[in-house]
Amino acid sequence: MDKNDTMKNATIIFCHFVFYCISFSLQAQSSKKLISGPWAGNVELRTASIWLEVSKQVKKVHLTYKSKGSEKANKVAYRGNLERDFNPVKIDLVGLDFNTNYEYDIWVDDEKIELPFATKFTTKDLWQFRKPAPDFSFLAGSCNYTNEVIYDRPGKSYGGDSSIYETMAATPAQFNLWLGDNWYYREVDYSSVWGLQYRASHDRSKSALQSLMASMPQYAIWDDHDFGPNDANQSFIFKQDSRSIFNDYFLNPTCGQDHKGIYTQFSYSDADFFLTDNRYFRSHENLEDSIDGKPNNKKSFLGEQQMEWLKNALLSSKATFKFIVSGNQVLNQLNPFESMQHYSFEYNSLLQFLKTHKINGVIFLTGDRHHGEVIRLDREGNYPLYDITLSPLTSGVAKPHASELNNPQRIENTLIEEQHFGKISISGPKNDRALTLEFIGKKGQIISTWKINQKEITKQ
């Protein structure tokens, strides 16, 4: 090899090196511009929304999407504000086809973002009046604590193994439902609006979450820790700001009514989900539960406005299964901590309403307790009610209180004292639909199962 060849080869190697460095630098810059996401939510028959968060230096965002196998892609630009401290982005897609697979790409400052996971979603099927209700599954869980040592309490870290989210991402399901305490505000967070925004943004950005969020649509309620301080109630001075932040970081269909609360509703197949808000309207737990021997009608758990909405929504529902979703347990009579049981006026009102109007198929779905269980409430002359509690995802595990260790309401073999999530599957022919609950551990192992037929939660 002569000197010229040596110089030529050296030049080629150098050019490859420079190209690699530039490519790596551009990829690193792109990744820094994308804080978290993207993921698809509120996926309906002909519409969907895409969520992501970008950094302060980003000036514009758009996405391209197409049905799977199609050559032509559509472009939608984000028209909202950017270049702020926190920049959650929502882009709505309309005019879609039902029961269709879609793929999408994110572009930040005209650069396509390369991601280690697929970005896709499937619109709902138009099954009504045409075919049997589709079988489906969904995931659910509560209490996601992300460690940040400088702001955490001294001692052992409260947050657990976040690999549970990789397990959830790999578990086939149509959507995931967050049951509250989806992040944990600390003392440094809930004393300012900026602090609330920081916590939501910081915890959502964790790498372990990204594949789960992208793998299926996400729905959510909140509890105290992602609303404000521990056991927070209607007195929290930043409750309106907290509501806005929650709405910024999730893609629920709506967010309360009249700019109050976060309650909403969605449907999948022959199931309706009533996502309640147990914080915005809530009275303090220690307010008198009864006055002169009568339930105190001024002590609110859901509040009058939300209770009226819930009752009317239940009356309107024709679903086989009606899931009332709450951040706190509802039916556990031995729960000494936060529970709707301690708000007897609203609790009695709701149960009497279910009885009077013969509302069938009701299942309560709750979080908060740092252990899982299924609670049964027998009712004279009516079907029993069930409360499925799923907790925790990554926060600390807690045993039941001594007073409820041998709770006669608890279904046998459903006490779960480890990190877990639930997979709930609805299947079967019309009038013989069944619900199967699997408690699944962080490594994907099935810890316990429970099953019930629609006939068992129907007034005969």
Give residue spans per PLM region.
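Metal-dependent phosphoester/phosphodiester hydrolase catalytic core
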Residues: Q29-Q460
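Bacterial Sec-dependent N-terminal signal peptides
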Residues: M1-K32
